[in-house]
Amino acid sequence: MANAPCSYGAFEITVGVLPDVPEAESVLSAISGAGYEGTELGPPGYLGDRLTLRKSLANHGLALVGGYIPIRFSEPEHWTEDLAAMDATLDLFAAADGTQAKPVLADGGSAERIRFPGRAAVDRSIGLDEAGWARFAEGVAQACDLARTRGFEPTFHHHTATFVEAPWEIERVLELTDVGLLLDTGHLRLGGGDPTTALREWGSRINHIHIKDVHDEVLAGVIADAADMPEAWHRGVFCELGTGDVDLDSFFAELSRSDYSGWLVVEQDMVPRSPRDAADAAASQVRNRAWLAEHAGL
């Protein structure tokens, strides 16, 4: 079982932007103290650089299990820049002895998709056309080649407010590429899919799992207000396990019947608004770990 800095308020839209993001050392201490055995990287450099990351993780008995790598796959003019950034992230993996870490490839999205979270399941017009999918697949192939050349097996993270959000978009990625799939229970729910069905149907491709719960009504409010994905984060669309609308009991029952043997990463993205929020987030992750022990036997 692993956790991630985003559960404590440290991710791409907060680090270096908001004043109440907790220090990395306190996050690592909280992850270890809650009973998790690994962590994802968070924004590159947040947990440490190539000289310090391995020691920081070892001091808390944590393995590096993955790191989020956004790439603008639909925009080839940005591939050189984004793949160079990916290569630098893989340098961190190597420096941390992250031999089991998954490069978590994700679509860098577009301004349009960021404005319309949770809509692609019912409105395919905001998705890619056939030429766009061909470009997208070529970009994914290049990223996979880079990861494998560096000795890491990648995974692809479907994500709300990107070009791979809805089940039909995930299926296109699986059809057009050979990349493994990161199944995220929360983002799939927000994208109009069912995590249990996905685990059953896509199980042979799944090589990494994020465990999330979500409040459906928060996303519904965001859509009703014509708000964007950052606003969904600010409104707290992700919640503690067992308190939202994802049928996690069904998901874990299906998981127990599957052959999956990779990491499970608990994520509860939150945006810190005061110094107190870091302590509240740490308490939430303790409760999430206890929920998993009680309900999933993990």
Can you say where each PLM-predicted feature lies in the sequence?
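Histidine-acidic metal/acid-base catalytic patches
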Residues: 1-32, 58, 91, 97, ...
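Conserved beta-strand positions in the central sheet of alpha/beta enzyme cores
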Residues: 40, 66, 102-104, 155, ...
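Active-site mouth loops of central-metabolism enzymes
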Residues: 7-23, 42, 74-81, 125-133, ...
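Short, flexible active-site-adjacent loop segments at beta-strand->alpha-helix junctions, enriched
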Residues: 5-7, 63, 68-70, 107-111, ...
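Acidic-and-aromatic substrate-binding clefts and catalytic sites of carbohydrate-active enzymes
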Residues: 38-52, 72-82, 160-165, 187-193, ...
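Active-site acidic/histidine proton-transfer and metal-coordination neighborhood
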Residues: 59, 78-181
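Aromatic-lined substrate-binding rim segments of carbohydrate-active enzymes
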Residues: 48-68
